[in-house]
Regions:
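Charge-patterned, phosphorylation-rich low-complexity C-terminal interaction regions
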Residues: 117-118
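Non-catalytic accessory regions outside enzyme or core folds
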Residues: 1-78
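Single conserved hydrophobic/aromatic residue that forms the stacking wall/gate
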Residues: 121-132
Length: 132
């Protein structure tokens, strides 16, 4: 399955589970489809997702990760005051790390906007087992 087919499938499944999206028009251009998919991921309410959906989502995210590249810790420089602390300005989804502190607001919940870069089903679905 190519990237466009994965996006089409994922958008279709997200439309099926939300009646408010029934009449949503899906753009034809790949870049616009990707923006729509990101918005749908970010505004999806927590609920179970099918194994097939999660598998295709994971494949799609691996493709996107490969396109954008991964930044590893050994390519970064710590701050002089504490060698355990690294500051990063850029796309945090590219970092190969265990934890991120992003105190963007007083609730520490981050941004709840549809076009925020990362708020995927992996994060919001309480029933999905976490692999360590």
């Amino acid at each position: 399955m190519d990237k466009d087919a994965m996006i089409t499938y994922l958008i279709g499944e997200l439309k099926k589970e939300n009646l408010e999206l029934h009449d949503l028009i899906v753009p034809e251009e790949l870049e616009e489809k990707q923006k729509l998919l990101r918005a749908l991921f970010n505004t999806r309410k927590p609920m179970a997702a099918s194994t097939q959906f999660l598998t295709i989502q994971d494949l799609y995210l691996q493709v996107r990760k490969g396109e954008r590249g991964i930044v590893q810790l050994n390519s970064l420089q710590s701050i002089p005051q504490d060698k355990r602390i690294y500051l990063w300005k850029g796309d945090i989804t590219r970092l190969e790390i265990d934890a991120i502190v992003n105190a963007a607001n007083k609730t520490l919940l981050g941004c709840m906007k549809p076009l925020h870069n990362l708020s995927l089903i992996h994060i919001s679905e309480p029933t999905r087992p976490i692999s360590i």
